Amino acid sequence: MKVELDSFSGTKIYPGRGTLFVRGDSKIFRFQSSKSASLFHQRKNPRRISWTVLYRRQHKKGISEESAKRRTRKTVKNQRAIVGASLELIKERRSQKPSDRKAARDVKLAKDKEAKKADKAARKAEKAKSAAAGAQSKVSKQQSKGAFQKVHATSR
């Protein structure tokens, strides 16, 4: 036994009951009663008519005893070690007081600044050394013999 559904109200239509309405675009609508057919032709919205299945579904009627509320699982935060930091190290850093952390940061920054300064001074000394050596070695054989030096144009 094939049971159809009313296109408007959503109620069951048993064999031998109801009517068919075929629209101009060949879409078929089945109605259980002339009441639902009439409301369909008046272009009424079944969600706003209280006795239809769509209305009852939208307003959660008659299903409260059927399905209990679904429980959602609570997320639990878990501490894990990451690359370059063990779990103990992370816990130790977390337990540090902000003032201690700030002091450690300042010490590290000062140390880095000193290292950068020393590196810069070393590079400057190296550059000066190479410049002094370079000035002597840049003279070619021709120039050392007293050959004519080309004068570069200073104006355009």
Swiss-Prot record:
<dbReference type="Pfam" id="PF01246">
    <property type="entry name" value="Ribosomal_L24e"/>
</dbReference>
<feature type="compositionally biased region" description="Basic and acidic residues">
    <location>
        <begin position="89"/>
        <end position="129"/>
    </location>
</feature>
<dbReference type="InterPro" id="IPR056366">
    <property type="entry name" value="Ribosomal_eL24"/>
</dbReference>
<protein>
    <recommendedName>
        <fullName>Large ribosomal subunit protein eL24</fullName>
    </recommendedName>
</protein>
<keyword id="KW-0689">Ribosomal protein</keyword>
<dbReference type="GO" id="GO:0003735">
    <property type="term" value="F:structural constituent of ribosome"/>
</dbReference>
<dbReference type="GO" id="GO:0022625">
    <property type="term" value="C:cytosolic large ribosomal subunit"/>
</dbReference>
<dbReference type="InterPro" id="IPR023442">
    <property type="entry name" value="Ribosomal_eL24_CS"/>
</dbReference>
<comment type="similarity">
    <text>Belongs to the eukaryotic ribosomal protein eL24 family.</text>
</comment>
<dbReference type="InterPro" id="IPR038630">
    <property type="entry name" value="L24e/L24_sf"/>
</dbReference>
<feature type="region of interest" description="Disordered">
    <location>
        <begin position="87"/>
        <end position="156"/>
    </location>
</feature>
<dbReference type="GO" id="GO:0002181">
    <property type="term" value="P:cytoplasmic translation"/>
</dbReference>
<feature type="compositionally biased region" description="Low complexity">
    <location>
        <begin position="130"/>
        <end position="147"/>
    </location>
</feature>
<dbReference type="InterPro" id="IPR000988">
    <property type="entry name" value="Ribosomal_eL24-rel_N"/>
</dbReference>
<dbReference type="GO" id="GO:0003729">
    <property type="term" value="F:mRNA binding"/>
</dbReference>
<keyword id="KW-0687">Ribonucleoprotein</keyword>
